[in-house]
Amino acid sequence: DLGVENVATLTLKDLGPQISWRTVFLVEYAGPLVIHPLIYLGAPLLWARFGYPFSMSFVQTTVFVLGMAHFLKRELESVFVHRFSNATMPAFNIVKNSTHYWLLSGLVLGGGVYSPSLGVEAVRGTVRDNHAFIWFFVLLWLLSELGNFRAHITLMNLRPKGTRVRQIPRGGAFELVSCPNYFFEALSWFAITAMTLSLSALIFLVVSSVQMTLWA
């Protein structure tokens, strides 16, 4: 039926060890969910041992809550929203992908934000101690997360469960930018970068934005 004769040569390609896309997503997003609480709770004790005692400021606590909410959202989307074109990817990708999230958004972002440089005394009298300033960017972050979620729902509805159907998304922010899911993701991290004026947050924002531009 397929037109294959007895003398035909069948070539197979060994793709190596494979792992499901969903598993990779769950593992990479789990990193920050574990690392951020450890740094947030442990940083004051650790820095005090080196002679730099500090108390967590309002902006630090705000970033902690927003960061945890962001990655919890990503975990839930990985389970209930995302639909993948392929069932698996090379197993090594779990190391590569997790390095980005565990190292950059976990250790680098957490280590920089939850440090004496943003503690109560350090931000006192600065814009980062202004609650109106912080709440403005919290609102921007919230709108960005909602925009990102709506884009993910739109993409989910384009692909019936159990299929590999590809369709062109229409409506909403898809009429304004090619990949609103990436756009709003970058915007949410811009909000955190702006409210903290943190170099570590800026590094994560730039690296993530470049990567999402390549994906787009």
PLM features per residue range, with description:
Residues K13-V24, E75-V95, N157-L176:
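Helix-loop boundary elements of multi-pass alpha-helical membrane proteins
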Residues L46, V123-R150, T154-A216:
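Hydrophobic transmembrane alpha-helices
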Residues P32-F50, G67-H82, Y101-S115, E145-I153, ...:
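Membrane-embedded alpha-helices of multi-pass membrane proteins, especially ion channels
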Residues S20-H36, M56-H70, T88-S105, R128-W141, ...:
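Transmembrane alpha-helices of multi-pass eukaryotic membrane proteins
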Residues D1-A48, F58:
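Ubiquitin system architectures
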Residues G3-L10, T61, A69, R74, ...:
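A broad, low-amplitude sensor of folded, mature protein cores
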Residues L38-T61, E75-N93, L109-F133, F190-I203:
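Membrane-lumen (extracellular) interface motif
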